[in-house]
Amino acid sequence: MHFIFIILSLSFVVNADVFPSSVTLSSNDFDTIIKWDNNVISYDVELMQYSHDEWRTVCTNSLGYCNLTNSDIDNDDETWVRFKYENKTSNEHNIGRVCEIVQITSPIVNMTRDGSIILLDIHHPMTYDNQYYIYNNITLCGFEFIYEATFIINDTIIPYSIDNQYCDDVHCLFYFISQEPVCVYVMGMEQYYEFGPKKTDNSTRVCVDGLIPRKIDTYFIKDFDDIDRVNNRLYRVVSDKYESNISSKFMHLYNNILSSFKLILQELMVNTEQ
């Protein structure tokens, strides 16, 4: 009798512990993984998202974790998982949204000097496989970072926010003038995401040497490349800040003015070089 009781008790314990009790969701640059606490039994893993309302198998015979990276999930959707083992199905586990928990690595930063003009080039963070930029991409949560730059000039720390008017879907180009040695590191910040602020890691620190010898600069446009840079800057400021409030006729006129401005500058520079 005691032997039968022991067998029944052991059977109850095995059934009670057959499924994980703790399930977590992690994502690094959208390499997204579910992990659980039972690493003894292999499970089939099923997933359901709020907008689809149906269960589908995302992993089979998985031990300890299930990689969702190639499972075509909606990163901004509430998500549930459950486990299957033999003919049994676990309770459902709400694991939240990828957009809430994703950790994003640092932007790639380069800085170059051309005389007194310094170019800070900030490349947006990319997905774990270097396939997609994590910036203004609706399938990757739509994060639109403002880059918080920390400049170090002559041992003085100067914080500066790089507005997204300097940015496109690949990188941000920020020009400024300094003859001093300059170092900088950058962090991306999404202030207005609905589930709270989202930060990237800090970038590596990059530097440019000071200008030797020092000189007096009295003008900003020095060669043909500068003309395109100034034109692009003017166009981006106007289109980003005002395009939604002005007519297409005005934008057409504005583009004509920019083109004329470029032709005038080119003519002046050609005459100056002769």
Curated annotation (Swiss-Prot):
Family listed: Belongs to the type II cytokine receptor family.
Recorded superkingdom: Viruses
One Pfam family this sequence matches: IFNGR1_transm
Single annotated GO MF: cytokine receptor activity
Signal sequence segment: none
Record's protein name: Uncharacterized protein C6
Biological process, per Gene Ontology: type II interferon-mediated signaling pathway
